[in-house]
């Protein structure tokens, strides 16, 4: 990760991430640890798009899926009992949400390209909600 990426990450962490993290905590109902591998979330030529794509790819689907799961007490309890951590990374440049999400041993992993199909938020929400409902 070069200086440009480090500057972007710092700015994103200071300006957008706190609000997104608060929304995740509110949606999930507790302060779930977020393990974000920031250094993997870059492709040089797309740096100018990340302010828009990061929330759409990594955070808004989590918020909406957690809201769907915690819509009732049964969902709140299941999530609180099962979810230990959310890990966000990009190791395989997945752009299809079916391949980008996994849930094992209490860890929800989001392994998605930082840019591809950014506007497909609803599809990611559906796949993520289905994954959680099947594994909680």
Q: Locations of the language-model features?
A:
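Extended hydrophobic/Leu-rich segments
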Residues: 8-12, 24, 42, 115-116, ...
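N-terminal leader/targeting segments
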Residues: 1-17
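Short amphipathic alpha-helical segments that mediate assembly, nucleic-acid/protein binding
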Residues: 5, 17, 21, 59-62, ...
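Auxiliary, metal-adjacent structural segments of Zn-dependent hydrolase domains
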Residues: 46-117
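Acidic/histidine-rich, surface-exposed loop or edge segments in extracytoplasmic proteins
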Residues: 30-53
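Active-site recognition of the HExxH zinc-binding catalytic motif
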Residues: 110, 115-136
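Acidic, contiguous N-terminal accessory segments
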Residues: 16, 23-24, 30-34
């Amino acid at each position: 990760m070069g200086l440009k990426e480090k500057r972007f990450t710092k700015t994103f962490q200071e300006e957008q991430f706190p609000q997104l993290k608060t929304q995740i905590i509110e949606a999930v109902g507790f302060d779930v640890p977020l393990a974000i591998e920031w250094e993997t979330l870059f492709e040089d030529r797309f740096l100018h798009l990340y302010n828009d794509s990061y929330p759409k790819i990594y955070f808004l689907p989590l918020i909406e899926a957690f809201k769907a799961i915690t819509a009732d007490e049964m969902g709140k309890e299941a999530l609180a009992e099962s979810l230990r951590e959310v890990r966000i990374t990009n190791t395989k440049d997945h752009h299809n949400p079916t391949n980008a999400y996994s849930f094992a041993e209490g860890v929800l992993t989001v392994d998605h390209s930082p840019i591809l199909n950014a506007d497909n938020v609803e599809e990611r929400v559906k796949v993520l909600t289905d994954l959680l409902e099947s594994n909680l």
